Every structure is written in structure tokens, then in C-alpha cells.
Amino acid sequence: FTTSQIKGSSCIVEYFEPLASTGLGMFTITGLGHAYRFVGEAKAQDCEVDVNCVPEGTGQTAQRDGAVRISVKEGTLLGWCSGSLINNRAQDCKAYYLTAFHCGVNASTADFTAWKFYFKYQRSGCDSGAASTGSSVTGCVKRGDSNDGGGNTGSDFLLLEGEDAIPTSYNPYWYGWDANNTNPGSGVRCIHHPNGDEKKISTVNTIQSSSAWNGIQAQTHWRVTWAGTTNGWGVTEGGSSGSSIYNSSGLIVGTLTGGGSYCNSVQPNGQLQPDYYGKLSYHWESNGGPASDDLKNFLDPNNTGLKVMTGSYGPCGTLGMDDADGFEAPGVSPNPADGQVNITLPEGLKDASRIDVLDLSGRLVVSMRIGTDNTKL
């Protein structure tokens, strides 16, 4: 068990035991993290954008609900990282958290039991409203990693499984993902906790298909630059490490290793500098470590070979997808097909603006916007 931050220079620990066991109980405080100033007052840089700002956060509610702040412990060191709750093809509601390996490259099994995952740590408005630390779970075990020293020679991923189920009151969202090595193009975003602060959102300007974190492995990372938006110019900071970038369909395609972006008030022209995200396609099975550590073993446990997975608020529910009540699937004919197909949308999807067509391997075949007649394409 680990507490959240306690404000002040002293605290009282109370222990209650059954009357029949009076004086027999014992407990040990294994460690104490002390900050010389209240770390809750540490704030992100001034150009960052709150996740509930409009228009930046509009339509990003699910991805917001799947992003977590992580209190990390490595020996005597404490710090912040970001991460994402991620779905798997078994859709069994396992509490898998995807983050960066460098966040815990030296963490022991005992250290991981003290890691704390905060949901819903965000302002209710745009630069307004208080954030609560009350929605958290403690403890995890390591499942897989990039075996690269924290990005030295690979894509820098760490997959953890929470020791406890996530309370439904947290309204957790399990992110979907795309493990194809395809440039996600436009509409890419990142939700993160810079400097351990309330949840922020950053909007991608450009994304380079292949890059490297340290110049050794050229195919491991996406090189990203950020765009100015209505309410700021979202960048990344310490504490953002491990956060995901996701494509226009809301699917994770990479996790943050680091980079050179800053608000201009901190470093002139810092908002134009790039950051680097380890590719989920490289996490999949390309890092060269033990095959048992590959991400695909956990996200595709039944070895279907499919590389695209949708996100869900309840993956182990009856249908295992968002808003499943009364769901009607789009009509596709002929199916299978090797040429032209007709797609008919049910009433529940009449407001859809785009259609993505995937083949049986999960590869994106075509993506198109729906025309003026939005019931048939």
C-alpha cells in the first residue's frame, strides 16, 4: 500500500486491529518519500493545454479517460511518468498499462508494488477547476519491456499489469491500438501529465515515418512536432514520458521517449523542436530481447495475427465495445470482396463522418469521408 502525497511536515498513522488480537498486530513502513516543497504545486509550462479545453479536447473524452498519471519508484528515487490503459484482443479487462521502459528500467519487483496510477487527474474546465487525486490504484507487476536500457537501442516500452481491478466509478477506458508500421498522418494527439501536472493535450503538426531516439536504430521512433492551437501550444515535459500518441481513430501508435520541445517562455523556439515516440509497431516484436517480452504476446494472447484493436469502456462486457446497447453493425456487401463494396450505415451511425476499411489482417485498405448522403457510401 502506498499513500498519495501528504501536505505538511508531519502525519499520524493509525492502525486498527480486532479486539481479540489486541497488541498482536505488526506493520512496517518500508519507505518515506520527502519533498522539500509540496510537489503538488509544481506546474506544467505556460503553453500547455488542459485536456478539457475547447476545441482541443472536443471528441477526445474516451482517450482522456484512458490516460493515467503514474507515480514511479526506483530504489530511493521517486518521480512522475504518464501512461495509458490498453486493451488486448482477449478483451478480458486486464489492467494493462503501457508506458516507457526508461520510467522503470531499474525498478525492482518490490518497487513496482509501490507504483500508483491516477485516473481522472484533470481540471474540469480549461485552465479552471480543481483536480482530484482520489481516483487511484496501487501496485503492478512487469509483463513486458523493450529490453533496450530505456530506449538506448530500441523503442522504449514497458507493459505493466495492475495488481487490483480498476473501480468502475473511475470510468476507465481501455485504449485501442494499431501495430502496423504506417504513418498515422493528420489528426494525431497526445494526452499526458507534464511535470506530474493535471492532464494536458498536445496536437501533432508533423510526424516523420521513421526516426531514431539516439541515432542507432533508425526505425524505432516517430519524430513529432507540435501545432499551435486555440488555447496554447501543447509540448511535452518531464513527466510526459510514456504517454501515447494516438491516430485520428483514437488508436495508440507510439509512446514518448523524450525530445527537445519546450514552451517558448522556457526556451526560445522550443515549441518548434521535435519529440520522439517509440513505435507500437516496433514494440510488437522487433526489439531483439526475449520473445516472451514482446508486446504482441500480451495484446494478442491468442495469436490471431491481427494488428488493429478497438478501444472500449467495457472490453469484458457482453459485446466488448463502447456504447454497445442497441448497437447495429454497418452493412457491407458483397463480403468478402476484391473490388467495389457497398457500405450501409444504420441509424445509430448516421452522424459518422469517415469510414475506415480494414482487411482480415487488420491492415487499413482505404479511409474516406462520407458524402452528403451519409447513410450509404
Predicted segments with their positions:
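Catalytic nucleophile loop of clan PA
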Residues: 84-92, 233-256
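C-terminal outer-membrane/trafficking sorting elements
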Residues: 323-333, 337-377
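Exposed aromatic-hydrophobic patches
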Residues: 1-3, 376-377
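Short hydrophobic alpha-helix segments
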Residues: 101, 256, 368-369
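Residue-level detector of functionally pivotal "anchor" positions at catalytic/ligand-binding pockets or at interdomain
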Residues: 209-213, 296-333, 346-350, 363
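C-terminal subregion of chymotrypsin/trypsin-like serine protease catalytic domains
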Residues: 97, 109, 123, 127-139, ...
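Serine endopeptidase catalytic core focused on the charge-relay Asp
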Residues: 5-224, 238
